[in-house]
């Protein structure tokens, strides 16, 4: 009875899989980005945050920007490398700095990323405790012992590795007679004392290592409660303790209470037959959804958050299929699924490399062109030249040659073209939804088209008997009349009768130009009219000139692309050479914003105001926002997923939820301003590599990589005083949105911005102790207070060490002493010589006196 109740509760939790109306933005990484091979079979993440990918040729480490590859017999590795290139599985040890690698024919490898060394575990016929065979298919950590791993092999059953001793215990038909087969695809330690084993052609077994008991389940023809297929490729245990299996014949759920299986192969909503194909990987994500990877049928997603009962035949699914657009997989065969520590999803495909799905919604998404005619998620033309939103929330996109594309959400539901008789021209340059919900379209060489929202029909309107007019703007005034600006002036239409009320041009009015680009009426009833080549004009309702603004008067540009009035009654004018704001419509004083004020580009194409009063505008370098509360600009470019290339003039619309749409030469860029401007905590910068640069004169590359895994202190010799540092953030979803500043404290105590490549280079740094500091922030956010640091000590050469300097001082003192001693001795000798000389002179003088005395006495006596 308890088993029956448990089964009912289990099914209750399983029920009501909901279809999630969410599209996934998929980024692709492959051999072009440095991946060793596009056949990716397993993914894991180490304790330092780096991702590891096992492929059909080599092991790959990914730091967020660059791949480091590991091959068999790699000459770049100074120690023993990986034993094989053809891999099956990678697993990051949660207790140790080790990546475990299962190879197809070359045993088990353990890579210590702190020591950067490989340890190989291979079959040794002379050692009974070695790995029994080298064909390793899967790795599962032991839940009973921290020092244990369970290994499945293709030919010789299950192995248990005692990591401390390095010895293997063998579980196969020789040691466990109840095992149906030694060929295994996968093994899972369920944490309940049982191992769950997926066999090659022999179904699914539950094995108790303690008592060596085995239960085996296989497909039984005609039994819908049996295992759907006898090849079991993957097994997982979800958060509720349920066992899910991926087989060669679909997905199965093990009902432990009744010892049978729930199959999903008869699900009527499985339009791609994913759940009855070969299931190669199953992963439960943190949001309680199951992601199921299949061969040739992409990915199916089941939501486990349930509230009512549905049978397996009725559950709904979400799919990610192969396709050419950014919402599809690069290959229909998905081999593995992994969720990283930032909740991002990584998918390994068979031939399509890596597919990445961010946990965060993209700042900007693009409705882009696809050459595939029946692709409902894309435009039929590259250039979006006009935009408007109808009352049902559908976006009407006028294109430059493809007519009108209508989108509901991200799905194209209609195309209206000249060839189908709906519109007179496929080149749509202007559009408007009027106050009654009807749509107006202006075209190049096609005049005006009117779409009646009630009867869902188009009507062409001839202006002055001409149908080939170049219409650039359409506006509805406060009297609900329709103003049409074209290359011959302005036409005002009565929308009820479709008759022309008035036609204005430079000949019959005070208009300064016939080339009209934008029309807006302010709160005083005046009309602000922007032209191509003759600046801005302000007019009365009957187009009497009030004031004009041109370059001759100091206005920044004569080309006006769009004019809007915001909630504060300010007028914003997008020109070819700056953004102009009239703070008041009374005094007509204005301020011009240009590059010196923070604009990334001054060719302002289209303008919109969000719900918070911020002013958004497209330009030729991306999209910018004037943040009213901060009086500053936020700039977004291609690195933020804004389409590359120029944007279209006056091509903008908004939906009722506040989403803004800008048209460009590469599709429609849409975004939620609240999400785009949401404050994000600064990600921590990670120093990923330090490279000692070889001498520039050498033809060979003598650069040397320094291992930074052991700590944040590096000691270099005097000959290693030229080096480069590479850094990144480990959340790949932020990689293109992050900017960096750095400082080498001790050399220069100033912060410098990093321009590109996430790296800096220092050359000929003098001996000393330095601290390298690096900060990261998301574009337009604040810099953090804390920085990632690396202490670098450049040791002096032998002749500049402290003891060498001490010897130099001692020798110098000795030399000085000897010089002084010699000098003193010289002085003493000179003094003695002078004294002797003086004495000698005195003696000579005395002798001379004596001689004179004797001579004088002698003469006297004579």
For each feature predicted by the language model, list its residue ranges:
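Conserved beta-propeller blade signature
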Residues: 50-52, 98-100, 148-150, 194-196, ...
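Short loop/turn segments that connect beta-strands within beta-propeller blades
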Residues: 63-66, 112-116, 162-166, 208-212, ...
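Helical H-box environment at the start of the DHp/HisKA dimerization domain of histidine kinases
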Residues: 854-862
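Loop/turn residues immediately N-terminal
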Residues: 57-60, 105-108, 155-158, 201-204, ...
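Residue-level "micro-hotspots" composed of small/polar
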Residues: 8-10, 20-45, 51, 71-88, ...
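Residue-level detector of Asp-centered blade-edge/turn motifs that repeat once per structural unit
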Residues: 45-48, 92-96, 141-146, 189-192, ...
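Sec-dependent N-terminal signal peptides
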Residues: 5-15
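Cytosolic signal-transmission helices at domain junctions
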Residues: 818-853
């Amino acid at each position: 009875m308890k088993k029956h109740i448990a089964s009912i509760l289990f099914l209750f939790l399983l029920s009501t899989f909901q279809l999630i109306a969410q599209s996934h933005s998929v980024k692709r990484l492959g051999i072009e980005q440095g991946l060793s091979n596009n056949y990716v079979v397993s993914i894991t993440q180490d304790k330092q945050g780096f991702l590891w990918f096992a492929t059909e040729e080599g092991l790959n480490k990914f730091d967020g920007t660059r791949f480091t590859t590991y091959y068999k017999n790699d000459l770049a590795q100074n120690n023993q490398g990986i034993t094989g290139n053809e891999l099956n599985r990678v697993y990051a040890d949660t207790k140790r700095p080790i990546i475990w690698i299962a190879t197809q024919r070359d045993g088990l490898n353990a890579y210590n990323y702190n020591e950067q060394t490989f340890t190989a575990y291979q079959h040794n016929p002379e050692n009974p405790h070695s790995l029994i065979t080298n064909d390793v298919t899967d790795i599962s950590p032991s839940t009973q012992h921290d020092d244990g791993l369970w290994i499945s092999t293709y030919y010789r059953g299950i192995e248990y590795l005692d990591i401390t001793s390095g010895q293997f215990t063998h579980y196969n038909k020789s040691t466990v007679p109840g095992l149906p087969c030694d060929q295994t695809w996968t093994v899972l330690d369920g944490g309940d004392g049982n191992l769950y084993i997926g066999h090659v052609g022999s179904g699914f077994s539950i094995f108790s290592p303690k008592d060596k008991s085995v239960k085996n389940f296989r497909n039984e023809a005609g039994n819908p409660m049996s295992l759907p297929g006898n090849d079991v490729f993957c097994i997982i245990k979800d958060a509720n303790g349920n066992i899910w299996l991926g087989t060669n014949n679909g997905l199965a759920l093990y009902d432990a209470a009744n010892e049978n299986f729930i199959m999903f192969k008869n699900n009527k909503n499985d339009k791609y037959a994913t759940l009855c194909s070969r299931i190669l990987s199953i992963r439960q994500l943190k949001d309680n959804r199951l992601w199921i990877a299949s061969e040739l049928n992409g990915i199916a997603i089941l939501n486990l958050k349930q509230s009512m009962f549905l049978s397996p035949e009725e559950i709904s699914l979400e799919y990610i299929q192969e396709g050419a657009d950014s919402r599809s997989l690069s290959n229909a065969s998905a081999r593995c699924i992994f969720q990283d520590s930032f909740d991002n999803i990584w998918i390994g495909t068979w031939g399509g490399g890596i597919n990445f799905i961010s946990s965060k919604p993209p700042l900007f998404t693009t409705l882009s062109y696809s050459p595939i005619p029946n692709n409902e998620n894309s435009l039929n033309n590259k250039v979006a030249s006009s935009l408007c939103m109808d009352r049902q929330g559908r976006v009407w996109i006028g294109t430059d040659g493809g007519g009108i594309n209508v989108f509901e959400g991200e799905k194209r539901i209609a195309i209206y073209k000249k060839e189908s008789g709906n519109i007179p021209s496929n080149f749509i340059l202007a559009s408007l939804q009027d106050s009654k919900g009807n749509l107006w379209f202006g075209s190049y060489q096609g005049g005006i088209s009117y779409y009646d929202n009630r009867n869902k029909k188009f009507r062409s309107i001839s202006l002055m008997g001409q149908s080939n007019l170049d219409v650039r703007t359409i506006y509805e005034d406060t009297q609900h009349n329709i103003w049409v600006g074209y290359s011959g002036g302005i036409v005002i239409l009565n929308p009820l009768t479709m008759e022309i009320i008035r036609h204005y041009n430079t000949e019959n009015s005070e208009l300064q130009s016939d080339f009209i680009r934008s029309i807006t009426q302010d709160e005083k009833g005046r009309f602000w009219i922007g032209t191509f080549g003759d600046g801005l004009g302000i007019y009365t309702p009957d187009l009497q000139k009030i004031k004009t603004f041109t370059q001759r008067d100091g206005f920044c540009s004569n080309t006006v692309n769009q004019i809007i009035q915001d909630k504060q009654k300010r007028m914003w004018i997008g020109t070819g050479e700056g953004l102009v704001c009239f703070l008041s419509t009374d005094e007509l004083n204005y301020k011009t914003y240009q590059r010196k004020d923070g604009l990334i580009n001054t060719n302002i194409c289209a303008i919109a105001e969000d719900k918070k009063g911020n002013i958004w505008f497209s330009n030729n370098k991306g999209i910018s926002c004037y943040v009213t509360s901060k009086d500053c600009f936020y700039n977004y470019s291609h690195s933020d997923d804004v389409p590359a290339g120029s944007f279209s003039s006056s091509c903008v619309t908004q939906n009722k939820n506040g989403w803004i749409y800008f048209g460009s030469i590469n599709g429609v860029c849409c975004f939620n301003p609240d999400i785009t401007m949401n404050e994000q905590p600064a990600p921590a910068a990670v120093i990923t590599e330090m490279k000692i640069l070889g001498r520039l004169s050498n033809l060979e590359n003598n650069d040397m990589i320094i291992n930074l895994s052991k700590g944040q202190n590096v000691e270099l010799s005097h000959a290693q005083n030229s080096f480069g540092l590479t850094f990144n953030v480990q959340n790949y979803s932020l990689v293109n949105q992050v900017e960096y500043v750095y400082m080498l404290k001790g050399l220069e105590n100033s912060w410098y911005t990093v321009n590109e490549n996430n790296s800096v280079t220092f050359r000929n740094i003098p001996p000393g102790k330095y601290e390298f500091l690096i900060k990261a922030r998301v574009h337009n956010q604040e810099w953090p207070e804390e920085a990632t640091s690396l202490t670098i000590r450049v040791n002096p050469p032998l002749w500049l060490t402290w003891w060498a300097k001490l010897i130099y001082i001692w020798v110098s003192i000795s030399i000085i002493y000897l010089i002084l001693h010699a000098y003193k001795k010289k002085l003493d000798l000179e003094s003695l010589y002078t004294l002797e000389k003086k004495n000698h002179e005195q003696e000579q003088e005395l002798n001379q006196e004596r001689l004179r005395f004797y001579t004088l006495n002698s003469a006297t006596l004579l």
